[in-house]
């Protein structure tokens, strides 16, 4: 009798352990996303959309931080942006990402203070570079956007800025493309919604 109880406990524990290991081994990757797998702390492979298998306790899914900005939902006119992480459960998006960065200020060639309101569209084309070549891709893209805006606007006077919104956007996009290629991203477009001058 006692032997049967011990056998039952053993088989229940064994079955639960197997089910737990199987549960940890199968990973679902949603459409238009990928996941990175590390084996014993080193990058091993990229999981594609669908059901994938990993080795539990030896391999793990990387959960990187890719920050982006959204306008404050309580005040849509405000350019005080809310930061948020684009990556949930290790799902790295391969679709186009929209960044509505906080207000940037720049000084034109004729010393006018300019506040360009822009939206940046980019895509992660190489998730390995996007995670391992840069600490936080979203913040880095934003800082690069800010610096590039200041450089582009700094060589133009106020009149050129007013009439050259599209030209400024294209120049910024090509400058960003070149710099961000090393981070595994493709800048698809930069739209300047409005340009305000300090009164």
Please provide the spans of the model-predicted regions:
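N-terminal hydrophobic membrane-entry segments
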Residues: 1-199
